[in-house]
Amino acid sequence: MFGRVRRLWHIQRLVSRYGLREFVDGKPRGEGPREVRLREALESLGPVFIKFGQALSTRPDILPPEIALELAKLQDRVPPFPSSQAREIIESQLGKPIDEIFDDFSDEPLASASVAQVHTAKLKPEEPGAAGFDVVVKVLRPGVEVSIREDIKVLRTIASLVETLHPEGRRLCPKAIVAEYEKTILDELDMMREGANCALLRRNWLGSPLIYHPVVFFDYTSEKVLVMERLDGISIRELDHLRDRGVDFSVLAERGVEIFFKQVFRDNFFHADMHPGNILVNASNPAVPSYQAVDFGIVGTLTPGDQRYLAENFLAFFNRDYRRIAELHVESEWIPVGTRVEDFESAIRTVSEPIFGKPIKDISFGVFLLRLFHIARRFKYQVQPQLVLLQKTLLQVEGLGRQLYPDLDLWKTAKPVMEEWMKDRLGPGQVMQRLRREGPHMAEMLPELASQAIKSLERGEGLGVGKKTIAQMRQELQRNNRQQMRATVGAALLVGATVIAVAGSAHFPALLGMAWPAWLIDRKS
């Protein structure tokens, strides 16, 4: 507890030192531009806050441009730790001197991030005379786990205060969101897990002309060290460079939409850390450019029920079927029982209808999202912590989409992908596959169920379907329905946000803790 109080005090001191109260009252404080002071303060606070800054850097629509531009530097300019420490970690983890693993190892980091830093190297060839493989070596930052765990404790304290003191604290579920954030960010610290994530994405997209994932060298990968193929793509941040190469941004944007939907629905495994530093473009064929993915520490999955109900919401939204969206939310009980479907339908239509027919460049997503939050408050919608990761990633992807092709017809591009998925998922072929998969088990259970029913009747117990049992069954059905409907975060909070967000997403690829502070800021505003 003392450590948390000390950390909170440290944060307060940094706010004063860097004059950050200027962002609240508008009164100039400190030396130098306020955006530089904000970036330096976030760097001083460590990985959790750096990630927050990274998320904000993709939101020039809700931040002044100079602040968004400065926060983008957090992605490349985190001070590196000494290469001597990196060498020690590599040798300790892999059990060999570096010279026995690599023909060449660069002491100058290629990139330095809040969780790890990356060095370039060349693996020793397996056969004499052969060429070594160009690789990148990702090394976990020393002491980062201790630092993150301390900041998680601070976030827990803040979340508890918000849940207790804020009028809408319970609905926002801040403690549950922090718990999800903790799991996600701690998973990011395991390099072996990241390598496995990359391997699965590579398998899902092997041979695809849309996106490429690097080879992972598991013989040289451990909990704190990851060795993978070095890619030579152009960062998506270098728009002028891509433009000079003649890259067709419209094709790039359309391919991004396709990748997003296929990762979420076809593969049920998506890249969830989509800041610009993690997206490269292969411009070798500018007319049909493709993507290259890096950094796989954060990924997401959905349950089959999540996928189905998200798909229903997407398609209803694309078809402007606001009645169906409202019905789904009322049925799921994510909004209070007794809510009139007509009222919720009208609220969704009011916010959503104006965005159709507009290019993304003409849509203020920040204003749109604030309106969606207003609907959520009005209908006492329960925030779903398990989907904050997805929502947070959508915010990142939306920021990237604005950098590509603002005139993309998102609805025309995305709708066929979703309809094809629904057809494959719910068509006769899929039903037959499920029957073949589950039929033998069901057939095996039937005799036992019949035998138990007969024995109950012989004992004079009946089948026991009294009023109490019926009530229990109803509760169980409702509970199962709520579980199945988790994915319906709501058109007001997710569906509308998604379809705007994905215009130009590279691949769907988080750190979900950035979402709940945004909600708290919205509450205060």
Predicted regions and their residues:
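N-terminal accessory/targeting segments that precede structured cores
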Residues: 1-117, 123-127, 131-134, 142, ...
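Helix-rich C-lobe and terminal helical cap/extension of kinase-like folds
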Residues: 3, 25-33, 179, 222, ...
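ATP-dependent phospho-/nucleotidyl transfer catalytic cores
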Residues: 65, 72-79, 91, 145-150, ...
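A short beta-turn/loop motif at secondary-structure boundaries
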Residues: 107-113, 217-220, 388-389
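Hydrophobic HxD+1 residue recognition
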Residues: 272-276
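Hydrophobic residue at the +6 position relative to the catalytic HRD Asp in the kinase catalytic loop
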Residues: 277-281
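Alpha-helical transmembrane anchor segments
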Residues: 501-524
